[in-house]
Amino acid sequence: MKKLLLLSAIGMLLSAQTVTREQVDAWMTEISNWGRWGKDDQRGTLNLITPEKRKQALHLVKEGVSVSLAHTLEKEKFPDNPRPLGQQMTLDAGGHAMDLYTIWYHGSTITHIDALCHYSFEGKLYNGFIKSEKISESGCAALGVENQKDGIMTRAVLVDLPLLKNVPYLEPGTPVYPADVEAWEKYAHVKIGSGDALFLRTGRWARRAKLGPWNVAASAAGWHASMMPWFKKRDIALLGNDGVQDVQPSGIDKAPRPIHQLAIVALGLPLIDVMDLEAVAAECAKRHRWEFLVTLAAVPVPGGTGFPVNPIATF
């Protein structure tokens, strides 16, 4: 009898964590933020970072210690870096050095923020903008990265699941569920709330340092699609992790990146992909404090789908 009850409980748990393509499509409407900040809004959940929220975040600075959350750009080609940084130097007779960069930042080795025009669904962008009317070869006529030019400053919470699970890193393909994040809240004595930035450390860079590069775009630990209603309920303003956000493979037929689709298009939630959270994880563990002030800004490229960023944590 006990065995049957256990099997039943396991079955219910697995069922609760199974998300279908139909559910993802339904969430596009059910958890949508379209119209929440007006029909012309182009900032999405960044609206949740109010002046009061910024002032509260400043109180988290106690020591003035700052840590970068960005991965240093790489010039070598690897399985997770098929399009490495290009740098062309120019030296003139006057002794000045200049360079031209070629950066394919929408990948899995360059820390970058996604603008809200980066993803679409059924011909529409966040807040109902029509893709065919707003996106062309010359850029995004709405929802471009220039809408973030005033910068982002808020409270950030680091979720360090390898620490919670007492492992050096999560294996590729490991999904992260709401129960994992809530277990972390209890462990770290934090409560994730409105206007917060939420950063997930999977230990991707620790695994890479030990075992070498692999194709993170095809196989990575990350958020499970079932996190999306949770993100909406908690009113997360900014989402990031050290991989490509979505667990890969997603496990959902015809929905390879449900986190990207739902976060960007339905919620208007900007994403920071490919963060390097190793140093900040060490600083947090040293202090037994997993909340801090985070600041960042993207270069306001008109109509840009995103830009490389260097988020800074300050304790």
Segments predicted by a language model, with ranges:
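Active-/binding-site microenvironments in catalytic and ligand-binding cores
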Residues: 17-315
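Sec-dependent N-terminal signal peptides
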Residues: 3-12
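Basic side chains
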Residues: 2-3, 201
